[in-house]
C-alpha cells in the first residue's frame, strides 16, 4: 500500500464498511492519495457497518475518518431505514435487476455525495471516491453513470473550487467491474475483507447470508476463486 506524504493530494472516500467502499479506499491509497474517509449514520438498520468502517480506515492507513449523522429514517421509504419493510431474501440476480428494490434509500447517494463535497471543500481535497459498480446501477438510480456525471457537473457550479477553475472529480473506480472483479482487485491491494460487512439485515452482528448484498458477495468470492472470510448466519 502506498504511503501518503505531506505533499500528497487529498481525496475524500465514502466508506460504509462494506466490500465495495473498502476496495475504493484501497484504490485511493494505492494511488498515493491522502485519503480522508467519511461514513454516514443515516438511520440504517445495519449500523454494525460503521464500526467496521472505523477498523478498515485504520487498517488501510486513512489520514482521517469522520462519521456524520443524517437521519434518513425520519422519512422511511426503504427496507434499510424502516423496520416495517422486510429486507428481500433469497432472490436471484436476475430478479434483483428487474426493478428498483425496496432496499433503495431515497436520495441517499445524493445526500452522501453532498456531505463528501462539503468535507472535500473544507480540507482541500481534489477527488471524491464512491464505490458504486456495475451490479448496483442495474437497480439503483443513484448508482448510475448518468447520476455521477450530473453530480460532478453540479459540483463544478456549486462550489468555490469549481467556480475558481479547480473542480472536484467524482471517482468511481469500480463502476465497470463485476463483484468478482472487485474481489480480485481488492485482494491484490490487500483489502482486509474479513473486517467488512455487506449485509442488509445482520443477525447478532453476523451477515445473514440470504439478502441481496450477501448473495452477491458470496457469488463474487466464488467467481473470483478467492476464499470468502465472511461468517454467515445461514
Curated annotation (Swiss-Prot):
Cited Pfam families: QueC
Record organism: Anaeromyxobacter dehalogenans (strain 2CP-C)
Family statement drawn from the similarity comment of this UniProt entry: Belongs to the QueC family.
Keywords assigned: ATP-binding, Ligase, Metal-binding, Nucleotide-binding, Queuosine biosynthesis, Zinc
UniProt cofactor(s): Zn(2+)
GO biological process, one term: queuosine biosynthetic process
Disulfide bonds: none
Reactions it catalyzes: 7-carboxy-7-deazaguanine + NH4(+) + ATP = 7-cyano-7-deazaguanine + ADP + phosphate + H2O + H(+)
CC cofactor note: Binds 1 zinc ion per subunit.
Entry binding sites for ATP: 15-25
Originating gene: queC
Record-given protein name: 7-cyano-7-deazaguanine synthase
Higher taxonomy: Bacteria, Pseudomonadati, Myxococcota, Myxococcia, Myxococcales
InterPro entries, alphabetized: QueC, Rossmann-like_a/b/a_fold
Binding, Zn(2+): 199, 208, 211, 214
Function field: Catalyzes the ATP-dependent conversion of 7-carboxy-7-deazaguanine (CDG) to 7-cyano-7-deazaguanine (preQ(0)).
UniProt-recorded Gene Ontology molecular function terms: ATP binding; ligase activity, forming carbon-nitrogen bonds; zinc ion binding
Amino acid at each position: 500500500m502506498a504511503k501518503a506524504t505531506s505533499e500528497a493530494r487529498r481525496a475524500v472516500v465514502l466508506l460504509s464498511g462494506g466490500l465495495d467502499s473498502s476496495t475504493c479506499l484501497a484504490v485511493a491509497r494505492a494511488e498515493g492519495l491522502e485519503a480522508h474517509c467519511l461514513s454516514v449514520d443515516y438511520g440504517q438498520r445495519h449500523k454494525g457497518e460503521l464500526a467496521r468502517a472505523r477498523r478498515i480506515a485504520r487498517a488501510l492507513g486513512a489520514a482521517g475518518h469522520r462519521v456524520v449523522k443524517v437521519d434518513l429514517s425520519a422519512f422511511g421509504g426503504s427496507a434499510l431505514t424502516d423496520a416495517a419493510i422486510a429486507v428481500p431474501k433469497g432472490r436471484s440476480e436476475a430478479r434483483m435487476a428487474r426493478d428498483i428494490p425496496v432496499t433503495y434509500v431515497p436520495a441517499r447517494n445524493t445526500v452522501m455525495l453532498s456531505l463528501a463535497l462539503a468535507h472535500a471543500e473544507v480540507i482541500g481535497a481534489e477527488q471524491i471516491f464512491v464505490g458504486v459498480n456495475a451490479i448496483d446501477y442495474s437497480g439503483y438510480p443513484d448508482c448510475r453513470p448518468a447520476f455521477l456525471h450530473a453530480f460532478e457537473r453540479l459540483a463544478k457550479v456549486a462550489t468555490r473550487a469549481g467556480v475558481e477553475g479547480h473542480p472536484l472529480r467524482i471517482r468511481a473506480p469500480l463502476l465497470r467491474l463485476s463483484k468478482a472483479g472487485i474481489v480480485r482487485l481488492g485482494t491484490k491491494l490487500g483489502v482486509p475483507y474479513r473486517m467488512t460487512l455487506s449485509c442488509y439485515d445482520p443477525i447478532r452482528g453476523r451477515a445473514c447470508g440470504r439478502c441481496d448484498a450477501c448473495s452477491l458477495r458470496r457469488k463474487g468470492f466464488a467467481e473470483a476463486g478467492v476464499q470468502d472470510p465472511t461468517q454467515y448466519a445461514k
